[in-house]
Swiss-Prot record:
This is Leucyl/phenylalanyl-tRNA--protein transferase. It is an enzyme of class 2 (transferase). InterPro entries: Acyl_CoA_acyltransferase, Leu/Phe-tRNA_Trfase, Leu/Phe-tRNA_Trfase_C, Leu/Phe-tRNA_Trfase_N. Belongs to the L/F-transferase family. It comes from Pectobacterium atrosepticum (strain SCRI 1043 / ATCC BAA-672) (Erwinia carotovora subsp. atroseptica). GO terms for biological process: protein catabolic process. The gene is aat.
């Protein structure tokens, strides 16, 4: 396998199955973060991920971390918390605030650079990127953002300023997404936090099959309208 250099004159990506094994999933370098290129990338299960000072790097890891419908795991302490919490969640009410908060959450080595923020703001403006906000006494205390691909949602990052706020965001969003016909949440790479929530890994080839099957089927009308999300059931 080799690392591919993207042409600035073409939006074409190599086959994601040609990504490197080490580092896992690295596929290509270069190109830009235009809306057009990002749309092409996500249709093929490819996403940008790079640190400040690095060129744009494009990834498609194997295996792929995903959250299947109904598999979000709630610990005993989380269930206890849900019985007495004072949070409420909204959708697409404060995208800019959420992505900036996610960047601050990972400030020691954030990949959410100013260029990434600008690119995903543009994706939000054209209806491809969406945010979930969690509020406590009028203050933004948690949330997440990602990209819709039909009945798949590609989660990008989350943040939490209070205990359980990001978990609450994911729970409220997952149930909303499923009610509107959502099928799968892509979490990209498994880590200890997402694993504790019930995220699992599937082979890249299976993920790409799921992506192909569901990305051109729209969720039900009203899914992405700015709104308050229903209280999660558990």
């Amino acid at each position: 396998m080799r690392l591919y250099q993207l042409s600035p004159q073409s939006l074409q990506f190599p086959d994601p199955n040609h990504a490197l094994d080490n580092p896992n999933g690295l596929l290509a370098v270069g190109g830009d973060l235009s809306v057009a290129r990002l749309k092409v990338a996500y249709r093929q299960g490819i996403f940008p991920w790079f640190s400040p000072g690095e060129p744009i790097l494009w990834w498609s890891p194997n295996p792929r971390a995903v959250l299947l419908p109904g598999e979000l795991h709630l610990s005993r302490s989380m269930k206890k918390f849900l019985k007495r919490h004072t949070f409420h969640a909204t959708l697409n009410q404060a995208f800019d605030d959420v992505i900036h908060a996610c960047a601050q959450e990972h400030h020691d080595g954030t990949w959410i650079t100013p260029d990434i923020i600008s690119a995903y703001r543009q994706l939000h403006q054209v209806g491809k990127a969406h945010s979930v906000e969690v509020w406590h006494n009028g203050a933004l205390v948690g949330g997440l953002y990602g990209i819709e691909q039909g009945r798949l949602f590609c989660g990008e990052s989350m943040f939490s300023r209070m205990d359980n706020a990001s978990k609450y965001a994911l729970l409220a969003f997952q149930q909303h997404f499923i009610r509107h016909g959502g099928h799968l949440i892509d979490c990209q790479v498994l880590n200890s936090h997402t694993a504790s929530l019930g995220v699992s890994e599937i082979p890249r080839v299976r993920f790409l099959q799921q992506l192909s099957q569901w990305q051109d089927i729209a969720v039900e009308e009203g899914c992405w309208l700015p709104q308050q999300l229903a209280e999660p059931a558990f």
